[in-house]
Curated annotation (Swiss-Prot):
Transmembrane segments: none annotated. It comes from the Bacteria. The lineage of its organism: Bacteria, Pseudomonadati, Thermodesulfobacteriota, Desulfovibrionia, Desulfovibrionales. GO terms for molecular function: ATP binding; GTP binding. Belongs to the RapZ-like family. This is Nucleotide-binding protein Ddes_0972. Displays ATPase and GTPase activities.
Length: 310
C-alpha cells in the first residue's frame, strides 16, 4: 500500500505565539456604602486594572482588551458594578454568559453590610444613596436595593460583610483572599534610600537611621574619591567595631517589623540610611541591607539619593 506524501509549504515557517492564559476577572458589586469603592482601591494597589461604574454590558469588551499582551503586567482586572443601571441584573447575567463562552469565569464579590451601619455611614459622609434620587428616603432606598440585589448575592462566589469592618480590616480580607500564592515575594514593597544629612532627610521616609557614629571614609585620602559601592570603602566601613553589629541588628529589626506592617495592610515602607554626605557609609550600609531583604524575598528598590553630591 502506497503512502501519500504531502509537499512542505514554501516559504518560511511562522511560529505563532502561545495564547495568553485567561485573564483573572473579579466583578465587585453589592450594597451602596458597603465598601465597594474601598475594595476596588485595594485591588488597584495589588496590581489589578480597575474600572468602577462600568456598565455590565461592556464587561466582555473590557476583558477582551485586558487579554492583549500589552496589558499582561496587570495581575488581573477588577470591575465595579452597581444597581444604577435600570436593567443591571439582566445585563450582568448576559455579560457572564458572554464571558463563559470564551472560557472566562469571573469571581463575583458581593459587598454586604447591615442597615443600621449603612445609615450611620451615610449620615457621616452626608452623601445621597443612589436610589434617593428617585424620590425615596434613605431607609427605603437601602431596603429596595437590598431586595433588588438579593439574586446577585445568591450568585456570589464570596460575600464580605463589612458591618464591623474598618477600612484596614477590609484591606486585609481582600489581600488574604487574593494574595499571589505562587509568588515567593512578600506583598509589602521596601524602598531603601541612602542619603546625606547635609542635603536633607528624605521626606517619604518611614524609618531614618543615622550612621554618623561611624568613622568617615571621606577623611582617608585613598577612599575619598570612591563610594560605598566600592569594595575598599565597604570593607573600611564594616571593619569598624560596631558597624557589622549595627547592620545585623538593623536587619533583624526590619525582618521583625515588616511582616507586622504587612499584616496591617501596608503596601510599602521606606527606609532611609544617612551619613554626612551620602556617599560612603550610608551607601555601604544600604547595599548590605538591600541584599539581606532580597534574600528574605522582599521586593526592594534601592536609591542612592545623594551619591553624586557627597
Amino acid at each position: 500500500m502506497s503512502t501519500a506524501t504531502h509537499p512542505r509549504p514554501e516559504g518560511p515557517v511562522v511560529e505563532t505565539a502561545a495564547p495568553m492564559p485567561p485573564v483573572a476577572v473579579c466583578i465587585v458589586t453589592g450594597l451602596s456604602g458597603a465598601g465597594k469603592s474601598t475594595a476596588l482601591k485595594v485591588f488597584e494597589d495589588m496590581g489589578h486594572f480597575v474600572v468602577d461604574g462600568l456598565p455590565a454590558s461592556l464587561a466582555p469588551e473590557m476583558v477582551d482588551m485586558m487579554s492583549r499582551p500589552s496589558m499582561s503586567h496587570f495581575k488581573g482586572i477588577a470591575l465595579g458594578m452597581d444597581l444604577r443601571q435600570s436593567n443591571f441584573l439582566d445585563e450582568i447575567n448576559e455579560a457572564l454568559s458572554d464571558l463563559a463562552a470564551v472560557n472566562i469565569r469571573p469571581m463575583l464579590l458581593f459587598m454586604e453590610c447591615d442597615a443600621q451601619e449603612l445609615i450611620r455611614r451615610y449620615a457621616t459622609t452626608r452623601r445621597p444613596h443612589p436610589l434617593e434620587r428617585e424620590g425615596m428616603g434613605l431607609e427605603a432606598s437601602l431596603l429596595s436595593e437590598r431586595n433588588s440585589l438579593s439574586p446577585l448575592r445568591e450568585m456570589a462566589d464570596l460575600v464580605i460583610d463589612t458591618s464591623r469592618f474598618s477600612i484596614h480590616d477590609l484591606r486585609r480580607a481582600i489581600q488574604k483572599r487574593w494574595s499571589d500564592s505562587k509568588s515567593k515575594l512578600r506583598a509589602i514593597r521596601v524602598n531603601v534610600i541612602s542619603f546625606g544629612f547635609k542635603y536633607g532627610v528624605p521626606r517619604e521616609a518611614d524609618f531614618v537611621f543615622d550612621l554618623r557614629f561611624l568613622t568617615n571614609p571621606y577623611f582617608v585620602a585613598d577612599l575619598r574619591p570612591m563610594c560605598g559601592k566600592d569594595k575598599e570603602v565597604a570593607q573600611y566601613v564594616f571593619e569598624q567595631p560596631h558597624a557589622r553589629e549595627f547592620c545585623v541588628k538593623l536587619i533583624d529589626l526590619l525582618l521583625f517589623i515588616l511582616p507586622l506592617m504587612e499584616t496591617e495592610g501596608r503596601y510599602r515602607v521606606t527606609i532611609a540610611v544617612g551619613c554626612t554626605g551620602g556617599r560612603h557609609r550610608s551607601v555601604a550600609m544600604a547595599e548590605e541591607v538591600t541584599q539581606a531583604l532580597r534574600q528574605a524575598d522582599y521586593p526592594v528598590t534601592l536609591e542612592h539619593r545623594h551619591l553624586e553630591l557627597g
